[in-house]
Amino acid sequence: INVTDYLSQPVVIDEKMTAYDAVIALFTEDVGTVFVTAAEILVGLVSRKDLLKAAMGNNDLRTLPVRMVMTPVSKIIYVEGDEKALVAAQRLLEFEIDCLPVVRIEEDEQSKKKELHILGRISKTNITRLFADCAAGRRA
């Protein structure tokens, strides 16, 4: 069973947006993580914890660029779309995180840098749904 069988829609904001925009996205979409993109390429993510730290630092979230509070892509744990759901579950447990971006990796022809294109997200809830489906005999 691949992660793409159980992924959910990611909540995404542009890197030009503010930390306040990220707060609004978190609460209106009822998620714990918002992915940050630039020209549809994943550049980071923002969690509730990141935003709480920024707010406690007496920052004005309405003017603070989301880039200043996000976890950069170089530190993000992810899964590729063709990986097994078991791999995603193991990473969630190993790194003690709530969700992973599901990505397609491409190489930029000019810079030869790896670019992550976000396909979705897989969370503990998605993995629990898979487990429940297997236990109920709805998945082999």
Stretches with model-predicted labels:
Residues 29, 64, 74, 95, ...:
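Structured loop/turn residues at beta-strand edges in well-structured enzyme cores
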Residues 31, 35, 41-57, 111-135:
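Short beta->alpha transition motifs characteristic of CBS
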Residues 7, 30-31:
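A short helix-to-beta-strand capping loop
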